[in-house]
Curated annotation (Swiss-Prot):
GO terms for molecular function: endonuclease activity; GTP binding; GTPase activity; translation initiation factor activity. Keywords: Autocatalytic cleavage, Endonuclease, GTP-binding, Hydrolase, Initiation factor, Intron homing, Nuclease, Nucleotide-binding, Protein biosynthesis, Protein splicing. It comes from Pyrococcus abyssi (strain GE5 / Orsay). PANTHER family: EUKARYOTIC TRANSLATION INITIATION FACTOR 5B, TRANSLATION INITIATION FACTOR IF-2-RELATED. GO terms for cellular component: cytoplasm. The keyword Protein biosynthesis applies. Residues 399-616 form the tr-type G domain. The keyword DNA repair does not apply. NCBIfam families: aIF-2 (TIGR00491), intein_Cterm (TIGR01443), intein_Nterm (TIGR01445), PRK04004.1 (NF003078), PRK14845.1 (NF011418), small_GTP (TIGR00231). GO terms for biological process: intein-mediated protein splicing; intron homing. Residues 96-220 form the DOD-type homing endonuclease domain. This is Probable translation initiation factor IF-2. Coiled coil: none annotated. The intein interrupts the GTP-binding site.
């Protein structure tokens, strides 16, 4: 069989880049809190994850509005809120007739021409604004906020009257369910608005900001003019009529305005219209009157929908165009030349590509759905002005699973190191180009050579690798996945550490993963651009860039590097700057970089390539014709394809029609591949978000989407094995089942419930729990369900500290959340394994302390006292008797009952006094006066007599079983003395 070296699989772990921040007063809508500034949100989060002089990170458990990959808005979890020190420029971006937002220069905004940094925006650029903002719809959360009970009808009346008065806690516009908020809006608009021409105009005054966003809960986009809000445009007026409306003469005026108005917001997406037109086989001429929307006139929402409907039907003369491009027809050459498909009688690259697309009919409704979603969900507003100013203080940011959120009604975004590596495609397009795989990004070695140039000479040998395959998924998934031959899915890793901030929780987590799976790695010491006085040259190699720095900046870099080197030493690693490393098998290489400006990326790529070839060559040799092996990254449903699996193939070649065996929930799934799909190249015609290339085979290493029957139950993280023969199928089934059975747990024992997103992460979490001797009742893949909560509840009844759910990188289903709240079942979710377990252990400790405090408040402690023999210490003989005593063992408190040596009760201690001070407790050795209710000196008690605190059986059991560690030696002695007294009447006490 033919062997060749495949490209290494690289995972990126560690620091999440949070250089892109907003000023403290920028606001977000948080359904459980309201309309709050980022600073206020930070202050509500009490759990500090990390803190130093430069930044503070706090854990957050809130949901906020974000835009997902389909272009739709929804609520996503915000898991952390950051406060970061910033000294330098900030950019104020003000949109026309809308809000503004102030951000750090590198913060990206979504425009009609893709993501643009704040410092690259210019007046006239169109920026994305949501048409929908999501508030709270949960009555319980609302009632928890207002702390007042009213019926639904009473609340509606309250909100309506508040609207008429124009007075409300603005947070209620987002914390209250829509059914109440709409009543406020009705009252507000009834009292203050007019219908003028084709608009509804309301005087909003100080409510202009929150009111404009509250209207977005109903899909009503408004314009801001001073203190006025203006609702205009067909779909906004229609939504206003449907949700709010009028009950007087304005109702008719509103209907007339809707009739008169011609359209809604405009969408200047000229390039997208051209792309779709060509994809569906139309020339500009065939587009007729719609052609003007391609470069000169932006269509309204309604016009855009018409264009999309027209294009979606496809060109009736497509077969003719195919024949022309194939050279079978000579007609209409001029038109296709004008479109750039033919030049000098030959097909252009665009012409060749379109011929393939048209022949295979590789276009359908999915190609226009994304644009439809964008138009339904977002509005593009022109930038009015961009101002730059100096700022010295704190800036804030949020960590969300979608890397974007809505601030001040504007979509803002975060990016990663991998995004910067992808950007090198622009500079090196002619060198082969970076291609997008399913779940991975391939960087051909030609691109590495183009970027690195003379740096390749550092390795004194030709690089033979075909390229590098970067895994797109979160770092942990690259490692915590089952791989039959052992080890991790990644061959090599890049650990990203902020050189200014040092180690963070995810850094430590990543190091533990790398150590556990014995994965070689290099360190990218990011954000050197933030070193004071650092001279920036975009995309420059580090070794060239450092020569431009003054001595002070170089010295600061050296200091920070030594701090990092010291930290790695604590974890058992010898580390050094990459160009000073003598032996790469013994020393960890640190590459100083700026992901933001591309400094040092060249060295990083060359280092990865060189190390992979030098030290991993044998591991990277694969049997080209051998059966494929891979790992499932994700299971998802695709329109027209059904359930599919996204797989990284790390060995062999996978063919269309191969029989494969994959891991399922409780079985091995055997199925036949119906289609192998890879994303199309990132070009102007085909959109990789929704379009795939159908391929006949893929060879390792590669990311691929597999469509096949019966994949509904497939598990992320499980193996995929190609099986050419029935014997291979049985062997693969056995192998996969053994791995699943090793990880998925289902027992009747008392233990925690564990859920994870993949089999591999489930295995990793379970192992950590077992190492800490935390028992597991059930471990499975998937979101937290209602069944999981009920299972945890049954455990809770037996042992409260184990009646919990630990979820790694999973969501909690809505019904599960409701039951968990109602039944008080604790659910821990997170995306850092050790942090998840740490949180659980901390909670157990708190619960045990709480339980101990409760027991301490209820239990009676043992105590033995002796009355002084001298009559002078009898201060009162009765009602109550007051006598001087010494505590000879244990302790006494007011409220305890005293007994004699024969077990007879003599009375209750009402108070304890030492000189002029009343005490709540007296311990061994203390001499005090006590008041005894019910005792008479001379009849029931006598000077010199020994008395004992009366304990119940429950007291004794609680003290010995649950509070043993709180008992002092003297308490134990007192307990034994009391037990001796009580054993005369009750045999139970003889055992103590």
């Amino acid at each position: 069989m033919t062997k060749r070296i495949r490209q290494p699989i690289i995972a990126v772990l560690g620091h999440v880049d949070h250089g892109k921040c907003l000023l403290p007063d920028e606001k977000v809508v948080v359904p459980s809190v309201g309309f709050v500034t980022l600073k206020e949100l930070f202050e509500t989060a009490s759990k500090v994850v990390e803190r130093d002089d430069e930044k503070e990170i706090r854990e957050l458990d809130e949901r906020i509005t974000s835009v997902n990959g389909d272009g739709k808005t929804g609520l996503v979890k915000a898991s952390y809120v950051w406060k970061v020190r910033h000294k330098g420029k900030v950019i104020r971006v003000k949109l026309k007739n809308w809000h503004g937002v102030t951000v750090t220069p590198e913060h990206p905004f979504l425009t009609t021409k893709g993501w643009k940094r704040a410092d690259q925006l210019r007046p006239g650029d169109y920026v994305a604004v949501p048409r929908f903002i999501h508030g709270n719809e949960d009555e319980k959360i609302f009632l928890s906020y207002v702390k007042v009970k009213k019926s639904g009808e009473e609340w509606k009346e309250y909100f309506y009257l508040a609207g008429r008065k124009g007075n409300i806690d603005v947070n209620l516009l987002f914390v209250a369910p829509k059914r109440y908020v709409v009543e406020f809006l009705r009252g507000y608009f009834e009292e203050r608005s007019e219908v003028k021409g084709e608009s509804v105009i309301v005087e909003a005054r100080e409510l202009v900001e929150p009111l404009s966003l509250a209207l977005l809960r109903f899909g009503i986009f408004s314009k801001i003019q001073g203190s006025k809000l203006i609702v205009t445009g067909k779909r906004n007026l229609e939504a206003f009529k449907d949700y709010i409306g009028f009950k007087d003469e304005r109702e008719k005026a509103l209907e007339e305005a809707i009739e008169k108005v011609k359209g809604s917001e405009v969408y200047p997406i000229f390039e997208e219209i051209r792309r779709l037109r060509l994809l569906f086989g139309f020339t500009r001429e065939e587009l007729g009157s719609y052609a003007k929307y391609e470069n000169s006139e932006a269509p309204t929402y309604e016009e855009l929908m018409e264009i999309l409907d027209f294009i979606e039907r496809g060109s009736p003369s497509l077969s003719k165009k195919i024949a022309i491009l194939e050279g079978k027809l000579k007609a209409e050459l001029r038109v296709l030349e004008e479109e750039g498909l033919i030049k000098d009688g030959k097909l252009t690259p665009l012409g060749r590509e379109l011929l393939e697309v048209w022949r295979n009919r590789e276009f359908d409704s999915k190609d226009v759905d994304y644009i439809r979603n964008i138009a339904e969900t977002l509005v593009f507003i022109p930038v009015e002005n961009v101002e730059e100013e100096e700022y010295d203080g704190y800036v804030y940011d949020l960590t969300t699973e979608t890397h974007n959120f809505i601030a001040n009604g504007i979509l803002v975004h975060n990016t990663t190191l991998l995004d910067r590596i992808r950007k090198t495609n622009v500079a090196a397009k002619e060198a082969g180009g970076i291609t997008q795989h399913i779940g991975a990004t391939e960087v051909p070695i030609e691109v590495v050579k183009k970027i690195a140039g003379p740096l390749i000479k550092l390795w004194k040998a030709e690089i033979k690798l075909p390229g590098l395959l970067f895994i797109d998924t979160p770092g942990h998934e690259a490692f915590t996945s089952l791989r039959a031959r052992g080890g991790s899915l990644a061959d090599l890793a890049v650990l990203v550490v902020d050189i200014n901030e040092g180690f963070q929780p995810q850094t430590i987590e990543s190091i533990e993963i790398l150590r556990k799976y014995r994965t070689p790695f290099v360190v990218a010491a990011n954000k050197i651009d933030r070193i004071k006085g650092w001279v920036i040259e975009e995309d420059e190699p580090f070794l060239m860039n450092i020569k431009k720095q003054d001595q002070r900046a170089v010295q600061e870099l050296e200091t920070k590097l030594w701090e990092l080197i010291g930290k790695f030493y604590e974890f058992g690693f010898q580390a050094n700057r990459f160009d000073r490393v003598q032996n790469f098998t013994r020393e960890l290489a640190i590459v100083p970089i700026s992901a933001k400006y591309g400094i040092g990326i060249a060295e990083l790529l060359v280092l990865i390539a060189g190390l992979s070839q030098r030290y991993l060559e044998e591991k990277l040799k694969i049997e080209v014709e051998g059966p494929a092996r891979g790992t499932i990254l994700e299971v998802r449903e695709e329109p027209g394809l059904g359930h599919t699996i996204d797989v990284i193939i790390y060995d062999g070649t996978l063919h269309k029609d191969d029989t494969i065996v994959v891991g399922g929930k409780d079985k091995a799934i055997v199925t036949k591949i119906r289609a192998l799909l890879k994303p199309k190249p990132l070009d102007e015609i085909r959109d990789p978000r929704f379009r795939f290339d159908y391929v006949d085979e893929v060879t390792a290493a590669a990311g691929v989407k597999i469509a096949a029957p019966g994949l509904e139950e497939a598990l992320a993280g499980s193996p995929v094995i190609a099986a050419p023969t029935p014997e291979d199928v049985e062997k693969a089934k056995q192998e996969i089942l053994e791995q699943i059975e090793r990880v998925v747990i289902s027992t009747d024992k008392v233990g925690v419930i564990v859920k994870a997103d993949t089999l591999g992460s489930l295995e990793a979490l379970s192992k950590e729990l077992q190492e800490k001797e935390i028992p597991i009742r059930k471990a499975d893949v998937g979101n937290v369900s209602k069944t999981d909560v009920m299972e945890a509840l049954s455990v809770k009844e037996e042992e409260p500290k184990y009646g919990v759910i630990l979820g790694f990188n999973v969501k909690v289903n809505e019904d599960a959340e409701e039951v968990a709240k109602a039944k008080d079942v604790k659910i821990f979710v997170g995306n850092v394994i050790y942090k998840l377990i740490e949180d659980y252990e901390e909670w157990v400790k708190e619960e045990e302390e709480k339980k101990k405090r409760e027991l301490l408040s209820k239990v009676t402690f043992p105590g033995v006292i002796r009355l002084y023999p001298d009559e002078r210490y009898v201060f009162r003989r009765s009602n109550p008797a007051i006598v001087g005593i010494e505590v000879i063992e244990g302790r006494i408190k007011p409220g305890v009952t005293l007994i004699k040596q024969n077990g007879q009760k003599v009375g209750v201690i009402r108070s304890i006094k030492s000189r002029d001070e009343f005490l709540q407790e007296a311990k061994k050795g203390q001499a005090v006066a006590i008041a005894i209710e019910g005792a008479i000196v001379g009849r029931h008690i006598h000077p010199g007599e020994t008395l004992y605190v009366d304990l119940s059986r429950d007291d004794a059991i609680t003290l010995l079983k649950h509070l043993r560690d709180t008992l002092e030696d003297t308490d134990i002695k007192a307990l034994k003395m009391i037990a001796k007294v009580k054993a005369k009447e009750d045999p139970f006490w003889r055992a103590i």
